[in-house]
């Protein structure tokens, strides 16, 4: 895995995966799409979609644990703070040889810079929330969210997927 290349690719994902508008009905549709995809693949994950301050969709699939819910919360907090994907922030910290606690004073008990939370961006409004998955390895959590967003927005996932490691 090339961190610089992944960071560039994640930036392209964040630029491309923008909703023209977003409301609770769209959150429900996206959440159900993610639930169906995870169920078909046998993923034991938690799925969370929020606008900042308002939960819109949550599901814990068979095999997910309360620990996944806490990972969701901590990854979601990273997106809320930085307005970037949690994986991008984690890779930046890895590249810098630093932690969120060291560099930004953010406690790891509340912020997790691991893959799986992605900014919910609306054209003309910016980042308004996050879409999060937890239960797979961090890169797979990130890509699961990106794949679902591509399907929801009619984008070609193959063109936006991270390089295979």
Curated annotation (Swiss-Prot):
Matching SUPFAM superfamilies: GlcG-like
Pfam name, any one: HbpS-like
InterPro entries: PduO/GlcC-like, PduO/GlcC-like_sf, YBR137W-like
Domain of life of the native organism: Bacteria
HAMAP family per record: UPF0303
Similarity comment text for this entry: Belongs to the UPF0303 family.
Name of this chain's protein: UPF0303 protein BamMC406_1480
Lineage start: Bacteria, Pseudomonadati, Pseudomonadota, Betaproteobacteria, Burkholderiales
């Amino acid at each position: 895995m090339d961190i610089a290349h992944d960071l560039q690719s994640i930036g392209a994902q964040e630029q491309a995966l923008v909703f023209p508008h977003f409301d609770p009905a769209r959150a429900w549709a996206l959440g159900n799409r993610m639930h169906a995809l995870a169920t078909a693949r046998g993923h034991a994950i938690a799925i969370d979609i929020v606008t900042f301050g308002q939960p819109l969709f949550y599901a814990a699939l068979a095999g997910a644990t309360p620990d996944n819910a806490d990972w969701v919360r901590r990854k979601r907090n990273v997106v809320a703070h930085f307005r970037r994907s949690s994986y991008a922030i984690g890779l930046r910290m890895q590249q810098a040889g630093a932690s969120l606690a060291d560099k930004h004073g953010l406690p790891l008990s509340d912020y997790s810079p691991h893959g799986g939370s992605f900014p919910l961006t609306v054209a003309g409004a910016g980042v308004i929330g996050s879409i999060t998955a937890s239960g797979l390895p961090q890169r797979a959590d990130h890509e699961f969210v990106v794949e679902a967003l591509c399907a929801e927005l009619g984008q070609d996932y193959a063109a936006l997927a991270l390089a295979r490691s």
